[in-house]
């Protein structure tokens, strides 16, 4: 197997990334510095890290490509970052793309044909692959070959193209939308969980160091507490709170500034934002708390169904604001109380 010393990122936009090096800019460099390079640097997801560490070591000891990996869970939990870390730990190149970007089977064939032994192909939003594209993956994943049809009419014939052993890492927010044949070809399946407040605090403190910003411990805790268990949200909030602190002339981000900034951003003490509250109010005021079907809800709030199901519902479900039943979603008493509304049946 050919092993390289560092991860080489290849994406569709070659103007943005060339030879694995992102074009220099302070903001891009800062974003890259937030991304851990090893499993030890990767915060949170302890179970996933422990398992992946074993699988990676075993693959390296056998001098084999790592088995194909499926990472699923809500957005912003570090699936893409973990894919980069896995490739880095393996010491191989990583090529990155997304399901919607692979429009036809030929696009995927070109990607697969350009892989070196042991390389990682990362496909984000893999549930959005077109069916003809997905079918090309079956033989590629299972037996490391693809059949290419050449010619037209009576001259049509299939060419058998062997592929080097490689690892496909697929990421999805909607694992249920993967077809069974594709899902069954992943030897490693990992469910990414929401982060604890303590884990998010560490991420906030690490990110503040990268941003050359100081944040008070109580401010970091409050920011982490309202970040929906999601590192991406925590980092986004930190950037905005940093803006407020700089305008106020604070050298260290205070709790008061953090609370004031999050209030301005309309993020409440449970981490609910304007869209969360609109979803809950729609179910309460328009449908007496539910049950409400996803199509009806999406039409009423002006969001697409996939966004609601992947971005908003997982957090609302896990934190007890809604329940899912056979006829749709229903709000809980906790949702009424959070919105300051009387709970039905209470006197």
From Swiss-Prot:
Q: Where does the UniProt entry say this protein principally localizes?
A: cytoplasm
Alphabetical GO biological process terms: DNA recombination; DNA repair
CDD domains referenced in this protein's UniProt entry, alphabetically: AAA (cd00009)
Provide the residue positions that the database annotates as binding DNA: 329
Q: Which residues are recorded as binding ATP?
A: 34-35, 76, 79-81, 142-144, 185, 195, 232
Which SUPFAM superfamilies does this entry report, sorted A to Z?
Answer: P-loop containing nucleoside triphosphate hydrolases, Winged helix' DNA-binding domain
Reactions it catalyzes: ATP + H2O = ADP + phosphate + H(+)
Give the span(s) annotated as Small ATPAse domain (RuvB-S).
Answer: 196-266
Mind listing the GO molecular function terms for this protein?
ATP binding; ATP hydrolysis activity; four-way junction DNA binding; four-way junction helicase activity
Q: What is its EC number?
A: 3.6.4.-
Where on the tree of life does the source sit, at the highest rank?
A: Bacteria
What residue spans carry the region label Head domain (RuvB-H)?
Answer: 269-347
Q: Which Gene3D superfamilies match?
A: 1.10.8.60, P-loop containing nucleotide triphosphate hydrolases, Winged helix-like DNA-binding domain superfamily/Winged helix DNA-binding domain
Location in the cell reads: Cytoplasm
| Reported function | The RuvA-RuvB-RuvC complex processes Holliday junction (HJ) DNA during genetic recombination and DNA repair, while the RuvA-RuvB complex plays an important role in the rescue of blocked DNA replication forks via replication fork reversal (RFR). RuvA specifically binds to HJ cruciform DNA, conferring on it an open structure. The RuvB hexamer acts as an ATP-dependent pump, pulling dsDNA into and through the RuvAB complex. RuvB forms 2 homohexamers on either side of HJ DNA bound by 1 or 2 RuvA tetramers; 4 subunits per hexamer contact DNA at a time.
Q: Which NCBIfam families match?
A: PRK00080.1, ruvB
This protein's domain notes:
Has 3 domains, the large (RuvB-L) and small ATPase (RuvB-S) domains and the C-terminal head (RuvB-H) domain. The head domain binds DNA, while the ATPase domains jointly bind ATP, ADP or are empty depending on the state of the subunit in the translocation cycle. During a single DNA translocation step the structure of each domain remains the same, but their relative positions change.
Q: Which family does it belong to?
A: Belongs to the RuvB family.
Q: What is this protein called?
A: Holliday junction branch migration complex subunit RuvB
